[in-house]
Amino acid sequence: SDFENLLKNEGYHVWVNPVYCPDYGIPQTRKRLVLLASRLGNIELINPTHKPNEYKTVKETIGDLPELKAGETDKNDPLHRAKALSPLNLERLHHTPYGGSWKDWPKDLQLRCHKTDNGRSFGSVYGRMVWEKPAPTMTTQCTGLGNGRFGHPIQDRAISIREAALIQTFPMT
């Protein structure tokens, strides 16, 4: 890239590679391009620390947190709060099986936009995460049910702020 060449022309040693975050113990399926540059000599990222059968899972990351209902806040942790859901979205989530999404709903619960050719391509929205796998990439709207596969694996709610933070590897404190 132009930026990489600029760095090299300025005397930097450059390492650029895609990184799959679960390979480094991060419990989300985030892919990122990482660029490291040094004027002190060759530089590169450490080798992956986790193999696929060792990837950190949703259950390992958030499975010990207290249960919540949609709209509730844990009395001991103000960040462990789940957004309230409309009765219609609670009904939709109730019809979303483990690991499922809006595609599993009865037709009368499906949104009009999902019935169009364009809408069918967004198969993971209103989806539930799976305990045994890393979470999807956390986004700025990850505590909202309709913004991706951010439904709790077994509770009828979207993930809490605390759960999203833990999945992003922020500490409890």
Regions found by a protein language model. Give the residues of each.
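Conserved Class I SAM-dependent methyltransferase catalytic core
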Residues: 1-29, 33-37
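Residues that form generic nucleotide/phosphate-binding pockets
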Residues: 6, 61-68, 96, 141, ...
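Sequence-level motif detector for i,i+2 pairs with an aromatic at +2
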Residues: 14, 30, 53, 133-135, ...
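Glycine-rich, flexible loop/turn motifs
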Residues: 15, 20-22, 58-61, 146, ...
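Short, solvent-exposed coil/turn elements at secondary-structure transition points
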Residues: 20-22, 68, 173
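Short, solvent-exposed loop/turn segments at secondary-structure junctions
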Residues: 22-24, 40-42, 143-145
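Flexible, glycine-/basic-rich loop-and-beta segments that form/coincide
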Residues: 26-80
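C-terminal target-recognition/interaction regions appended to catalytic cores
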Residues: 80-173
